[in-house]
Amino acid sequence: MGVTRSQLKKIMPNAPYVRIDKYLDYLNKAMQEFGIITKEREAHFLAQVAHESAEMRYTRELASGDKYEGRKDLGNIQKGDGRRFKGRGFIQVTGRANYTRYKLFCGYDVVSKPELLELPRGATRSAAWFFTAGCGQNLCILADLDNGRNTELILQNITKVVNGGLNGLDSRRRYLQRAKNAL
């Protein structure tokens, strides 16, 4: 299916068209490549992207990354890994282990050049990869279960996987409703 410029603007009303135009083709290619191709999948994916990236404003986590220093659960085993492998991409890929897994998947050396995830192709493709495989499960399967009556439960479960908790749930809920209306 894919998302149009006007649909993306309805989902992310604060994103200027210049930003939408910068990412739209990359976003559609990534969604197609990773099977994010139904209304439900697109809506849940774009809601997470909208929140995590502040409507495509950020492709790199604003925080320093110090809170990830020494986090073995993220594979951060070398001094400086916390800052080096802080969240990047539209769905913040975080930690040496996740960067390494994405490198093995895509073939781009994002371990040596983490900033590749800040570029349009890296930001969109890594987000789609994380949503469908990189998080350890395919969140499209959860999105497929959204029948309109269980939307809140599906949203909460997807958010827990993407975020590790329910941070920003109200925002994600608004984006999801906009996406469902726009698509």
How does the language model describe each region?
Residues 2-21, 26, 45-132:
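Peptidoglycan-targeting cell-wall enzymes and recognition modules
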Residues 9, 28-32, 128, 159, ...:
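Amphipathic alpha-helical segments within well-ordered protein domains
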Residues 15, 33-37, 81, 115-118, ...:
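Conserved aromatic-histidine-acidic binding/catalytic patches
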Residues 17, 34, 51-61, 137, ...:
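Secretory-pathway/luminal and periplasmic proteins that interact with or process carbohydrate-rich
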Residues 35-45, 58-62, 138-154:
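Surface-exposed patches in mature extracellular/periplasmic domains of secreted proteins
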Residues 49-52, 141-168:
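Acidic helix/loop microenvironments that form the catalytic cleft of cell-wall polysaccharide enzymes
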Residues 160-183:
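Extracellular low-complexity, O-glycosylation-prone Ser/Thr/Pro/Gly-rich "stalks"
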